[in-house]
């Protein structure tokens, strides 16, 4: 049977359910933990349909392995940001930081999350570099996906993935991928390059399974004179299909480890990583490892593909972005092409904005991070300085990659031979650490580090700026701030747009980041007044255009027909550039009818800004600018009005009281303008709150569902869980700002907002469309109880409303269950209309309720009561942490519910 054969091939050594292989190698260094294995495959992963079709049980990996195995991966889903893009079928992890807007998908993980996963990176957090949309390959077509080997060969080959798996020896080994733009944001702060900003997490490590490319090329028999191997993928872009090349002798050298891969961490390749087949080139920049492979061509010369010539190059530093546009021969010069990675490293802990208290802290702090090199060269030393390079100390280095060299003879993993014992080459990153006494950190201004590889190639002190901003690898520096009772650490940059590091701070203060002293004054240097020169302004308008455009005209072009967008108050027509945009038309559609200033200015290069005059059609009038920006500075001064909330203007209320209901949750009470003033919030909707960040004074805006009933008068109560800063991660900006707000301070409110309104007696509207409900199934966790409670009370408080409500409240511990007594009272008084099921993932021994997560395994036995009655649909109302929401959605979809049966708050 074809289906059985297909799934058998794809499922060879797939990570099985209920299997947790463990590592026997005990590490004494402070290496971030690599979880020993994956308990079970994602049920909403790219291959879940094939899993269910398979009748062949996967081989188990419950024997002991002497090396790290992949971390457990979390369920993913198609994110709302991608729904209007060509990638609307690709499941992704919301933790990944988008670096180029919504589309195309270019992301890195938060640095601490990446480091904490350990040596191997899960599919969830692996960085992604996509030049355009993801080519779509259906699961049923994977084994039939064809690629060819042609050119200067005696035996041209056309083969498919089935042939690749059946006819050639399979290998498995770890490889660290690094984007050539890793740490580019540091260069962009010094001067904007033509590349978008990467933080220091543009790298990841995975186990790859496939065939040595030398085996395939040997079968094709390259002819005399052949010197290069060109690769081309299926991703069609404005300048053709993405392609590149490397040298033939590298491909034929087993030490180089070049592979044609079809598995990642034991599972078939996910869409973002080349599904169904890709090239893996250890030790070289990620841009050479073509995804969605279609062609391998043997040639006498390097690739003439547009992307091989105009990408992944380090041009001489004196060439500016403007000059580079008119130097085609320089771009074609192969000596500027990047292949092997350079020595590079970063400090992961202390994390950005991490604080270490002076009291109740250990006597020393373990500084930790990563390092890597290219071309198979091993990192041989990592050095740390606390005095700007006057003296250095050696760090400890741990090489988890070496554990794979200890694999027993004949060992296989995920269907491939663990082919490492004989290799002298190093394909992966390593981890380093160094204990530094806290007293020494107190007396230092910064921590800097550098790495060296076995060729004695050491990271330079100073940056080598280039037009593409690639291969940035100067010493990694974090600044130490002495505060009242703690040390605060500041990284050079942060991957997100709004979080700044010391480089931005120094530059904004007028410092020269190229002065050889990190923009600061050298000891003994005479203080002089620095006049900060204004940055060179790129003209982004056409001086011959003087048309005034209204908000009505702009909104008429907010769709895919003639999309207009706004940058700095100027209006541009993106229609002529739909086919030429590097990210595809979806990038322009996503900005249609909107003010794209912040995103455009932060992401785009000087060249892109210089192109804007071509598309300039007019200026937004002043009134329209105010409307488009949300009229941010205006508030409603009509204090005597009947209803407090206003949809288009902000209204002020004064903080009157804070009431703690758990260690990290409070009810914030606000006094309205007069005792008879109604809140004005329909059931099921929420409001927006605005206040200023106490440090930056920038506006913080978040949405909340009040604890108060929407018809209450004179007061507004909001239940909020406060996410405090920890040594591992930064807490919630808004919640901590609210917690620090003194009684008597004003806060701005606007609303109502939301797509769902409950009108009573089983009638609701979703996006203004009426819907009859015969039973509510409500699922929440933590402070997600607030919108659920609001709808539940609206039902129960109306004696004529007979709509049954089944509530699943999932939390970690008893202390996390908010409004517990109130919900129990509602259930006891209304058994025919209300049932509350509490579930704890970390219950105490005396807990008698549901144990575990709210999912398909635990929910069905509670679904019968209270029974659904009357006409209409069962509607799921869901609010909680993102991982919980995704798991709940997957579980109920698996139980037969449809996507339009969900309302997510």
UniProtKB/Swiss-Prot annotation:
Keywords: Disulfide bond, FAD, Flavoprotein, Heme, Iron, Metal-binding, Molybdenum, NADP, Nitrate assimilation, Oxidoreductase. It is an enzyme of class 1 (oxidoreductase). SUPFAM superfamilies: Cytochrome b5-like heme/steroid binding domain (SSF55856), E set domains (SSF81296), Ferredoxin reductase-like, C-terminal NADP-linked domain (SSF52343), Oxidoreductase molybdopterin-binding domain (SSF56524), Riboflavin synthase domain-like (SSF63380). GO terms for biological process: nitrate assimilation; nitric oxide biosynthetic process; sulfur compound metabolic process. FAD binds at residues 702-705, 719-723, 733-735, 783, 786. Residues 648-759 form the FAD-binding FR-type domain. Nitrate reductase is a key enzyme involved in the first step of nitrate assimilation in plants, fungi and bacteria. This is Nitrate reductase [NADPH]. It comes from Fusarium oxysporum. The lineage of its organism: Eukaryota, Fungi, Dikarya, Ascomycota, Pezizomycotina.
């Amino acid at each position: 049977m074809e289906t059985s054969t297909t799934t058998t091939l794809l499922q060879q050594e797939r990570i099985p359910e209920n299997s947790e292989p463990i590592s026997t190698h005990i590490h004494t260094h402070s290496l971030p933990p690599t979880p020993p294995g994956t308990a079970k495959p994602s049920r909403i992963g790219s291959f879940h349909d094939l899993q269910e079709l398979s009748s062949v049980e996967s081989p188990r990996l419950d024997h002991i392995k002497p090396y790290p195995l992949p971390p457990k991966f979390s369920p993913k889903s198609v994110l709302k940001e991608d729904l209007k893009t060509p990638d609307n079928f690709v499941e992704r992890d919301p933790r990944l930081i988008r670096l180029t807007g919504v589309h195309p998908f270019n992301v890195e993980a938060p640095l601490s999350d990446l480091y904490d996963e350990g040596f191997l990176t899960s599919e969830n957090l692996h960085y992604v570099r996509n030049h355009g949309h993801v080519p779509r390959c259906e699961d049923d077509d994977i084994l039939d996906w064809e690629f060819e080997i042609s050119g200067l060969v005696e035996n041209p080959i056309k083969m498919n993935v089935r042939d690749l798996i059946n006819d050639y020896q399979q290998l498995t080994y770890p490889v660290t991928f690094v984007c050539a733009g890793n740490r580019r944001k540091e260069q962009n702060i010094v001067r904007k390059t033509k590349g978008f900003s990467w933080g220091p997490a543009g790298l990841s490590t995975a186990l790859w399974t496939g065939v040595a490319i030398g085996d395939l090329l040997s079968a094709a028999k390259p002819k005399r004179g052949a010197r290069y191997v060109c690769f081309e993928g299926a991703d069609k872009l404005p300048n053709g299909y993405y392609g590149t090349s490397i040298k033939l002798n590298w491909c034929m050298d087993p030490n180089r480890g070049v592979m044609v891969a079809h598995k990642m961490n034991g599972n078939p390749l996910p869409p973002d990583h080349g599904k169904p087949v890709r090239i893996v080139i250890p030790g070289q920049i990620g841009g050479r490892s073509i995804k969605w492979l279609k062609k391998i061509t043997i040639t006498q010369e390097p690739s003439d593909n547009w992307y091989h010539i105009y990408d992944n190059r380090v041009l001489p530093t004196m060439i500016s972005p403007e000059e580079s546009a008119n130097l085609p021969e320089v771009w074609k010069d192969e000596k500027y092409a990047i292949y092997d990675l350079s020595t590079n490293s970063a400090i992961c802990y202390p994390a950005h904005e991490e604080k270490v208290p002076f009291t109740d802290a250990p006597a020393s702090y373990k500084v930790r991070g990563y390092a890597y090199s290219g071309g198979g060269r091993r990192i041989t030393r990592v050095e740390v300085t606390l005095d700007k390079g006057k003296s250095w100390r050696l760090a400890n280095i741990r090489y988890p990659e070496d554990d794979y060299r200890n694999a027993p003879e004949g060992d296989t993993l995920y269907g491939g031979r663990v082919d490492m014992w004989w290799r002298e080459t190093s394909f992966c990153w390593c981890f380093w650490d160094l204990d530094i006494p806290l007293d020494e950190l107190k007396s230092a201004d910064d921590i800097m580090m550098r790495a060296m590889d076995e060729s004695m190639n050491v990271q330079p002190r100073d940056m080598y700026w280039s037009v593409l901003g690639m291969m940035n690898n100067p010493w990694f520096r974090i600044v130490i701030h002495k505060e009242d009772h703690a040390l605060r650490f500041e990284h050079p940059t942060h991957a997100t747009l709004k979080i700044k590091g010391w480089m931005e701070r120094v530059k904004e203060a007028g410092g020269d980041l190229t002065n050889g002293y990190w923009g600061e004054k050298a000891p003994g240097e005479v203080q002089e007044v620095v006049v900060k020169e204004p940055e060179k302004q790129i003209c982004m308008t056409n001086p011959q255009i003087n048309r005034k455009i209204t908000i009505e005209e702009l909104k008429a072009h907010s769709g895919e027909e003639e999309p207009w967008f706004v940058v700095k108050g100027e209006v541009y027509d993106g229609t002529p550039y739909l086919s030429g945009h590097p990210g595809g038309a979806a990038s322009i559609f996503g900005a249609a009818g909107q003010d794209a200033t912040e995103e455009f200015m932060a992401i785009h290069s000087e060249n892109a800004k210089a192109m804007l005059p071509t598309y300039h059609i007019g200026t937004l009038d002043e009134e329209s600018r105010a409307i488009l920006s949300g009229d941010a500075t205006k508030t409603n001064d009509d204090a005597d009005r009947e209803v407090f909330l206003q949809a288009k203007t902000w209204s002020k209320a004064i903080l009157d009281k804070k009431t703690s209901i758990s260690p990290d949750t409070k009810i914030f009470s606000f006094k309205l303008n007069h005792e008879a003033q109604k809140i004005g919030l329909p059931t099921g909707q929420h409001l927006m709150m605005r206040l200023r960040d106490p440090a930056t004074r920038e506006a913080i805006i978040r949405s909340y569902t009040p604890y108060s009933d929407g018809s209450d008068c004179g007061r507004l109560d909001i239940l909020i869980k406060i996410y405090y800063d920890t040594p591992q991660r930064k807490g919630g900006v808004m919640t901590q700002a609210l917690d620090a707000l003194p009684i008597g301070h004003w806060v701005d409110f606007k609303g109502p907002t939301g797509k769902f309104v409950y009108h009573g007696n089983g009638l609701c509207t979703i996006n203004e469309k009426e819907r009859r409900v015969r039973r509510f199934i409500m699922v929440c966790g933590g402070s997600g109880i607030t919108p659920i409670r609001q709808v539940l009370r609206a039902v129960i408080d109306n004696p004529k409303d007979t709509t049954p409500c089944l509530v699943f409240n999932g939390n970690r511990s008893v202390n996390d269950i908010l409004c517990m007594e109130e919900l129990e009272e509602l259930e006891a008084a209304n058994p025919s209309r209300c049932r509350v099921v509490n579930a704890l993932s970390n219950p105490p021994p005396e807990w008698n309720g549901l144990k575990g997560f709210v999912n398909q395994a635990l929910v069905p036995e509670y679904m019968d009561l209270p029974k659904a009655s009357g006409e209409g649909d069962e509607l799921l109302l869901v609010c909680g942490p993102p991982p919980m929401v995704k798991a709940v959605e997957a579980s109920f979809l698996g139980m037969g519910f449809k996507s339009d049966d969900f309302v997510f708050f």
